[in-house]
């Protein structure tokens, strides 16, 4: 287990190496889950590289989204909520090292949160398109960074207060997400940052918010509150039982709320001509911002996986832990490889697809969508050894800034 395996996207710091090592396989399960969702995330990014000419909506349009595309996109829905949940969990582990008094996580959260926002604005937008973009998108790194900054100031509150706050935020934000304020409204900028996906600054470059922050703050609070069950000395059987109960509670609430179209998703599901389409509609949730149903599905699934791999040590957990142990390096590297590969393919073969907006791109057609899955698996193995090397280098080095990656 590396000293920084939980720091970059999740919030455990490099200085906590002794603390994290003492948690042993429990922390390995966290790394493995993070690595798993990052591998799934790559599949979605490969899709966006090779199949961007076929845009998917939010929520998706069932009548124009074939099942292979729907379920590929649906799998990626688990990634961001689990990232943010593990961010809070990792921050709690830092603040409560085993065998030592509790310590403040404020400075750690502030520094890493600010770094993630910086990377989102000045690095990620470039990596997505391979040039300085006309639009800057505030996406997952921005919202993780912002949530970390909020948690930095809230982490001194009693855990019960954060638990209630997290539940209230996650449970009630759906009441307000359909409200859109016009650009000339004095509260438009704040509303866009926190609640509604929109243009933040209509400048050059234009700044757009993809991930409104408010519901994600609730998720990071809940992750922090889950931290104690991963403390050293916590009975592993009891931890697995609690994780299963948490996952079952999330999915049971989802089945009731979604099944009866009570609350939690602004778009109700209906019966379609085929069973597959009906299932797709039932699972068709809003991501930007995440609906309550979206979060229940993803966080509940994450709890089940954590329970299943708790204290596991096998080829699967070791493979996934490699990616989860150096998450920022892996994240930046996979985007750099994808955009470089795309530019080469475009230069060699030229554009062969046209989007609905008339933009010509290189890509694969519906009959070749399997290439997206094959490229994803190949990318896992291409990036495995560089990520493993960097994880080892990060553990050995005394260079301070390397620990942030």
Regions found by a protein language model. Name each.
Residues 2-405:
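Alpha-helical transmembrane segments and their immediate juxtamembrane cytosolic regions
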